[in-house]
From Swiss-Prot:
It comes from Drosophila lowei (Fruit fly). Its cofactor is Cu cation. This is Cytochrome c oxidase subunit 2. Its EC number is 7.1.1.9. Component of the cytochrome c oxidase (complex IV, CIV), a multisubunit enzyme composed of a catalytic core of 3 subunits and several supernumerary subunits. The complex exists as a monomer or a dimer and forms supercomplexes (SCs) in the inner mitochondrial membrane with ubiquinol-cytochrome c oxidoreductase (cytochrome b-c1 complex, complex III, CIII). The gene is mt:CoII. The lineage of its organism: Eukaryota, Metazoa, Ecdysozoa, Arthropoda, Hexapoda.
Length: 229
């Protein structure tokens, strides 16, 4: 989750988020190089004393400023396209989770198991425990197994919502009447926080998401106890 004075992205908890961070750093490096080059050229133009009133055209410089940006765009586009295909790929999921957005809470269904569904509301500030996070903790967490391919189906019951967990690199719009899907792979245990990322009304800020990532054997015990209860 985001912490005070956090300048970078959140620590990744999935391979896809690691790739997104690498691409961010790659694109930022290119932007810094362009900024330095343009700044150097502007500095030289402002402070040199050379004047050439007879320079009307220059084929070489025109070729350079046409070809160089095209090459730079290729260096940005190729890894970007690769990432787009990776984000859309569904790899034989071990478990499917369905998330339904409401004004203003989430409801979840574990499609592979019978009778495993629940609503997830934000815990009000006056009911938080001492170690809780304001506006981020919920009464019912999503429990998912680590080191497993997970497919999530997202929709909405009323208006457009967006199911987002930054540490996993996941952001899926929930649209009434449509079913969007993506997959992710959690590579470490822990709690991962997210929020609705689409303005959906007065209490849009109060729709947190909490994923509890646990080893597979703990997940099986949790599912068994939930089904039996």
């Amino acid at each position: 989750m985001s912490t005070w004075a956090n300048l970078g992205l959140q620590d990744s908890a999935s391979p896809l988020m690691e790739q997104l961070i690498f691409f961010h750093d790659h694109a930022l490096l290119i932007l810094v190089m362009i900024t330095v080059l343009v700044g150097y050229l502007m500095f030289m133009l402002f402070f040199n004393s050379y004047v050439n009133r007879f320079l009307l055209h220059g084929q070489l410089i025109e070729m350079i400023w046409t070809i160089l940006p095209a090459i730079i765009l290729l260096f940005i586009a190729m890894p970007s396209l690769r990432l787009l295909y990776l984000l859309d790929e569904i790899n034989e999921p071990s478990i499917t989770l369905k998330s339904i957005g409401h004004q203003w809470y989430w409801s979840y269904e574990y499609s592979d198991f019978n009778n495993v569904e629940f609503d997830s509301y934000m815990i009000p500030t006056n009911e938080l425990s001492n170690d809780g996070f304001r506006l981020l903790d919920v009464d019912n967490r999503i429990v998912l197994p680590m080191n497993s391919q997970i497919r999530i189906l997202v929709t909405a019951a009323d208006v457009i919502h967006s199911w987002t967990v930054p540490a996993l690199g996941v952001k899926v719009d929930g649209t009434p009447g449509r079913l969007n899907q993506t997959n992710f792979f959690i590579n470490r245990p822990g709690l991962f926080y997210g929020q609705c990322s689409e303005i959906c009304g007065a209490n849009h800020s109060f729709m947190p998401i909490v994923i509890e990532s646990v080893p597979v054997n703990y997940f099986i015990k949790w599912i068994s106890s939930t089904v039996n209860s």
